[in-house]
Curated annotation (Swiss-Prot):
Function (record text): Necessary for normal cell division and for the maintenance of normal septation.
A GO CC term assigned to this protein in UniProt: cytosol
Cofactor requirement: Mg(2+)
HAMAP family: GTPase_EngB (MF_00321)
Pfam families cross-referenced by the UniProt entry: MMR_HSR1 (PF01926)
GO MF annotation terms: GTP binding; metal ion binding
Gene name in the database record: engB
Protein name, as recorded: Probable GTP-binding protein EngB
UniProt keyword annotations, A-Z: Cell cycle, Cell division, GTP-binding, Magnesium, Metal-binding, Nucleotide-binding, Septation
Lineage: Bacteria, Thermotogati, Thermotogota, Thermotogae, Thermotogales
Organism, as annotated: Thermosipho africanus (strain TCF52B)
Family named by the database record: Belongs to the TRAFAC class TrmE-Era-EngA-EngB-Septin-like GTPase superfamily. EngB GTPase family.
Binding site for GTP: 31-38, 57-61, 75-78, 143-146, 173-175
């Protein structure tokens, strides 16, 4: 897959903000704060479209990136730990819930980024169960895999495959080595990203 053009077309800050026109589907990137969503988007597009930070909570809005004038990459705010106010976290939750309820019909695939160094966190489990209830297809992207020794890596991949691998794709991924990028592109193509 070749990404020729990328354009930030809409940023959603409030649940009553208007969504952009629909295109040929949306590929959603969601995960805990500081799990690597913005870095992954930058790698996939070959551009620095998403701001990155060592501090959790940099993405505070829903960002719609038009890809090849055909479909969207949708970058959601992180959930879980972030040094932001309770009110700000509540706002993020509201816009995320609103997004999924209003745009589920146009979502092709949700990439759920999970820190592959750790077992499933409660917030991740809640999100995955919610996506199943909404009958949305998702793939689990295990981030930061380069930080694990081979034995730990094999153990964590087995752990996630035992939990979700029968029905969902598990992708070990590293921003450093670029492991998993080809699989993500492949899924985008399979699910209709042209």
């Amino acid at each position: 897959m070749k990404i020729k053009s990328v354009e930030l077309v809409k940023t959603i800050y409030k649940s009553n903000d208007k969504y952009p026109e629909s295109l040929n589907g949306e590929f959603v990137f969601v995960g805990r704060s500081n799990v690597g969503k913005s870095t992954l988007l930058n790698i996939l597009t070959g551009r620095n479209i998403a701001k990155t930070s060592k501090k959790p909570g940099k993405t505070a809005s829903i960002n719609f990136y038009k890809i090849n004038n055909s479909f969207y990459f949708v970058d959601l705010p992180g959930y879980g730990y972030a040094k932001v106010s309770v009110e700000e976290r509540a706002r993020w939750r509201k816009i995320i819930e609103n997004y999924f309820s209003k745009r589920a019909w146009n979502i092709k695939l949700v990439f759920v980024l999970i820190d592959g160094r750790h077992e499933l966190q409660k917030n991740d489990e809640i999100l995955l169960e919610w996506l199943k209830e909404l009958e949305l297809d998702f793939a689990i992207v295990m981030t930061k895999m380069d930080k694990l020794k081979n034995s730990e890596r094999a153990k964590m991949i087995r752990y996630y495959k035992d939990l979700y691998g029968e029905n969902y794709t598990i992708i070990p991924y590293s921003a450093i080595t670029r492991e998993g990028i080809d699989k993500i592109y492949e899924l985008i193509e399979i699910f209709g990203g042209v």
